[in-house]
């Protein structure tokens, strides 16, 4: 009712918005694309008004500080990162720590592992391409080849999420009533 929205392209590592611009900041599956997760975390919170709500949903890897990747997990993770040109995945624990280290969070960051709830989507995304082939053929031979090329990676993601190597993390934080301090190196 009277609400308006705009879609804009911006640099998530250096958002063009002034400090404290938004009541809510929502980020979905953007984190893996970010080369510096600490800068990304800070930018998400910087543009949030004091008392505002941050919600993030992202692909994450298991916290390898607690349990290092084994002999088969290392090549799987490398393939997933290479296929989708991601610099790295954070762990749920690691990204939560980065949010808290900004000192812009009131209290603790709440996290949840939604891997079980999102696991069926990997196979379903392949199935949707079969039952609705318009998307596969709409962009001609090149689009079809790119879509088919994704199938092994989607199956690999299903394996990674099913085995616990990858996790779908949800994050909720409230912006503290603090002035934004300069980023420390």
Name what the model sees in each region:
Residues 2-14:
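Conserved SAM-binding strand-loop segment of SAM-dependent methyltransferases
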């Amino acid at each position: 009712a009277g609400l308006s929205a705009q879609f804009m392209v911006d640099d998530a590592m250096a958002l063009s918005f002034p400090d404290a611009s938004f009541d809510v900041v929502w980020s979905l599956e953007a984190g893996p694309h970010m080369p510096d997760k600490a800068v990304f975390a800070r930018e998400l919170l910087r543009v949030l008004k004091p008392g505002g709500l941050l919600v993030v949903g992202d692909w994450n890897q298991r916290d390898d500080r607690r349990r290092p990747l084994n002999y088969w997990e290392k090549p799987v993770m490398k393939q997933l990162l290479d296929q989708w040109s991601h610099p790295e995945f954070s762990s749920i624990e690691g990204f939560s720590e980065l949010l808290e280290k900004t000192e812009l969070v009131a209290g603790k960051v709440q996290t949840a592992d939604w891997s079980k709830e999102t696991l069926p989507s990997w196979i379903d995304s392949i199935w949707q391409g079969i039952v609705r082939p318009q998307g596969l053929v709409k962009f001609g031979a090149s689009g079809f080849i790119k879509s088919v090329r994704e199938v092994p990676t989607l199956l690999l993601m299903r394996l990674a999420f099913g085995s616990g190597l990858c996790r779908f993390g949800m994050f909720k934080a409230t912006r503290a009533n603090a002035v934004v301090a300069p980023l420390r190196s």
